[in-house]
């Protein structure tokens, strides 16, 4: 809900000419305006200017693709009191370059626009760990790996796979709880892995991560999945 004492400021911005409004001090300007991206979910974040508490301000968000001259309003974040705005649907092409910008307004005053650095989802998004499912088959383990789902859709209407955009290497580790020993059981591109040679009457946990050779970076590790070998 927009604060009542800010409604006047919003109306003035929308209805008055630029010459009728005096820009606010620099301290009203939104700070640290940046995209934060995880699995191609692209969220614009910012901090309130130093002269106003965040709950006394309203914010206006615009975005554009690199090379475009016209900024587009983000309707859902036009006059918002939040310090973030989901621009996933406006930045769906992972290879394109985008900008976002934010302005603050309250009680007839407004700040200048603060623009993000150039943002490329493919380059900057962070990856979650793969989803891991394990099944015991006698004295061995079958491990199934699934990369995180993306908001992007393929031609059949299904969520695109992370493997559509990156060459991914999966790393699987086993932890022998009795010996408190970890070892790498697999590294490769397959999503179905058989782990053999396990010690009977022992408990094992399995974790996995994804590695991007092109960027030399890896995801966090998955949650442990544990099983007892009879």
Curated annotation (Swiss-Prot):
Cell wall biogenesis/degradation keyword on record: no
GO biological process terms, semicolon-separated: negative regulation of inflammatory response
Location in the cell: Secreted
Tissue specificity note: Highly expressed in lymph nodes and at lower levels in lung, spleen, and thymus. Not expressed in kidney, liver and heart.
Assigned keywords, A-Z: Disulfide bond, Receptor, Repeat, Secreted, Signal
Signal sequence, renumbered to the chain: 1-20
Entry's Gene Ontology molecular function annotations: interleukin-22 binding; interleukin-22 receptor activity
One Pfam assignment: Interfer-bind
GO cellular component: cytosol; extracellular region
Keyword RNA-binding: no
Residue span, Fibronectin type-III domain: 29-128, 129-230
Domain of life: Eukaryota
Chief localisation class: secreted
SS bond partners: 77-85, 205-226
Residues of the site described as Critical for IL22-binding: 66, 118
Family: Belongs to the type II cytokine receptor family.
Role noted for this protein: Receptor for IL22. Binds to IL22, prevents interaction with the functional IL-22R complex and blocks the activity of IL22 (in vitro). May play an important role as an IL22 antagonist in the regulation of inflammatory responses.
PANTHER family the UniProt entry points to: INTERFERON/INTERLEUKIN RECEPTOR, INTERLEUKIN-22 RECEPTOR SUBUNIT ALPHA-2
Name recorded for this polypeptide: Interleukin-22 receptor subunit alpha-2
Organism: Mus musculus (Mouse)
Lineage: Eukaryota, Metazoa, Chordata, Craniata, Vertebrata
